[in-house]
UniProtKB/Swiss-Prot annotation:
A motif (Nuclear localization signal) lies at residues 80-84. It is found in: Nucleus. This is CGG triplet repeat-binding protein 1. The modification Phosphoserine is found at S56, S164. Keywords: DNA-binding, Nucleus, Phosphoprotein, Transcription, Transcription regulation. Binding is severely inhibited by complete or partial cytosine-specific DNA methylation of the binding motif. The gene is CGGBP1.
Length: 167
């Protein structure tokens, strides 16, 4: 009798999971949103472990409100942390440097024309006045550096000016 009993065919136990998908496959599929570390799939902006087997779990996470909020915060932090290019930094410094040099050269020229010894620039009252009332006045060096570095430039400039006036 057992031979004639009809049994139902075994139910197919097919779930909707991809059995041979690795976290790296999902990273290449979803681009910069995800990264793989130690065989686990992470959301880059949320820093949450995701199930790499179910694609729907990943897409649901990427559409969620918490992910979009954290992604906006993550991008804002990256913008703030982003380094300035070297050329932009050097341009800022070069502008400030040229302004500093022009202030120092004007100060040396003023001292020479008014017959003020450069040693007077070392006096505390002169230093206080320059730093308080002159833009970049605190950047004027001591008298020995003024004499060594900036006096020859002023001398050459004045000689060229006198030579051009004589002709």
């Amino acid at each position: 009798m057992e031979r004639f009993v009809v049994t139902a065919p075994p139910a197919r136990n097919r779930s909707k999971t991809a059995l041979y998908v690795t976290p790296l496959d999902r990273v290449t599929e979803f681009g910069g949103e995800l990264h793989e570390d130690g065989g686990k799939l992470f959301c880059t902006s949320c820093n949450v472990v995701l199930n790499h087997v179910r694609k729907s779990a990943i897409s649901d996470h990427l559409k969620s409100k918490t992910h979009t909020k954290r992604k906006a915060e993550f991008e804002e932090q990256n913008v703030r942390k982003k380094q300035r290019p070297l050329t932009a930094s050097l341009q800022c410094n070069s502008t400030a440097q040229t302004e500093k040099v022009s202030v120092i050269q004007d100060f040396v020229k003023m001292c020479l024309e008014a017959n003020i010894p450069l040693e007077k620039a070392d006096h505390p009252a002169v230093r206080a006045f320059l730093s308080r009332h002159v833009k970049n006045g605190g950047s004027i060096p001591k008298s020995d550096q003024l004499r060594r570095a900036y006096l020859p430039d002023g001398y050459e400039n004045e000689n060229q000016l006198l030579n051009s006036q004589d002709c």
